[in-house]
């Protein structure tokens, strides 16, 4: 059995005035911005800070808590268990201009219309689809689940 290093993170599901969703591209997959909580930091503040750092967005407004997702990964010769607290966020006007944080491996930041989401979410992690499902987004906007024959 692995002994996991537990990590807390905050992330954001950001929308703009047009109702578009913000996605980032990292390691060849579409993702939502998120990052590690600093010692003593409120997790909502973590989510805001990380979204701003990874996307260049300004004047974000923190909205309601969505859900917590968990995933594991192997880095620096040990297993990590990351708990991510997800929040809705909004931005307005020029505060919605984006700049990818390339030093974190983010190659693109893109605003995506709801009708296009399923296409983008075919290339993401299952936990990211769960965040969208948690806000009650209709299944027609999510990637179809392939059944094993």
Positions of the model-derived regions?
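C-terminal lobe/hinge of AMP-binding adenylation domains
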Residues: 26-27
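Acidic, metal-coordinating catalytic segment for phosphate/diphosphate chemistry
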Residues: 1-11
